[in-house]
Amino acid sequence: MDVIKRHVDIAKREKYVFVPEIDKPTGQLMVCFDDGWAGIYEAKDFFIRNNIFPTIFVAVDLINSPGYLSLEQIKEMQSLGFRFEGHSWSHYDLTTYDDAGLLHEVKDSKDALSKMLGKEIKSICFPQGRFSDAVVRCCQDAGYLKLYSSISGGYYDLLGEKNLICRNLVQSVTDKQFKYIIDSKSSFFVKRTMKLHYQR
């Protein structure tokens, strides 16, 4: 939590606004967490006090598992304004599946999570950040409107026909690096992180 608190302080000092979803090219920050770790529930009051309502990408198979959010906690947080979206069924690298396995991970998880939460799941974050053209097509066919990657860059850098969205992973960066990233200077790393996460 210390890192998160420092980052929030920096963002506020630099006059950034935390929003549930980006709708402007500058001045906004959207907070996301992958996997649905139990610690997010323990930190929920901090986020509420700071008017920050993160999007949390959860894998169906991890819900109610030790160390992860329970369905009851997820529903409580959703009622408070936290957003939950898809992160596959099993949280494995989606590029490793055959067509049937990929469909289960992407479509069945979307349907199951939508039913659990009483709302349509419209976004997915690729587990381990890994994706391919086949994964993108499957996600689009399943009805996902936004596909969140782990490729560095601004929110709009990859938005296009593939509906891919850049995200900057900041849990391990210094305060100076964090400011550099939020000042929209992370696009420099798009090609490098693309090589790490994208498979044709």
Can you annotate each of these PLM segments?
Residues V60-S65, D93, Q128-R130, G153:
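Short histidine/acidic/glycine/proline-rich micro-motifs that form metal-
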Residues M30, T55, R83-E85, S123:
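A structural signal for isolated positions on well-ordered beta-strands in alpha/beta enzyme cores
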Residues V8-E14, A43-I52, L69-G86, Q140, ...:
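Acidic (Asp/Glu)-rich catalytic clusters
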Residues V58, W89, G160:
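Residue-level signal for pocket-adjacent positions within structured domains
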Residues S88, F126-P127:
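Thr-Gly-centered strand-to-loop micro-motif
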Residues L62, L69-H104:
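Histidine/lysine/aspartate-rich catalytic loop segments that bind and position anionic ligands
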Residues F57, H87, L147-S149:
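Short beta-strand and adjacent tight-turn residues that come in two discontinuous sequence segments
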